[in-house]
């Protein structure tokens, strides 16, 4: 599993562009920048839609004022779903990153297997602060949204 001090893997993921899904390299997102990335088990799921993503959307200006260049939300969903979820949640200040096949999540060692619930392999709920591609903070939530909440990450940035 990835840990503080590790460099994020270089991979290609997807975002929803104006004309459809567009590839984006993790190096383009993280290298030379300070980034807050949080991951959720699934777009449009209750905890993710009522608490996790809205917390970052509401606090986006404060997070960026604390020296963060970008905020990224990642899920093992496709770009169409991530794009629609971002619009639904008014998450204009957040890069909605699709890890459609879960390869990035697997490379991080942060897979959550929800096959017993017919949801397949997803991402664990976490948040990290990444500086120039290197993990500075990694908070993983096993159940409730606490360690990976926007408020907790904002406090860590101060």
What do the PLM-derived regions correspond to, one by one?
Residues 1-158:
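Chalcogenol-based redox active-site neighborhoods
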């Amino acid at each position: 599993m990835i840990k503080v001090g590790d460099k994020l893997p270089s991979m290609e993921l997807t975002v929803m562009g104006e004309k459809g899904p567009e590839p984006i390299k993790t190096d383009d997102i993280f290298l030379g920048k300070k980034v807050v990335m949080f991951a959720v088990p699934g777009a449009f799921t209750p905890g993710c839609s009522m608490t996790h993503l809205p917390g970052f959307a509401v606090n986006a200006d404060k997070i960026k004022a604390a020296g963060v260049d970008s905020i990224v939300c990642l899920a093992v969903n496709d770009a169409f779903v991530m794009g629609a979820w971002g619009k639904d949640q008014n998450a204009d200040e957040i890069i909605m990153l699709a890890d459609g096949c879960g390869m990035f999540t697997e490379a991080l060692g942060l897979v959550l297997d929800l096959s017993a619930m017919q949801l397949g392999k997803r991402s664990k709920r976490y948040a990290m602060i990444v500086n120039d591609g290197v993990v500075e903070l990694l908070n993983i939530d096993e159940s409730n949204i606490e360690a990976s909440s926007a408020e907790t990450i904002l406090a860590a940035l101060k």
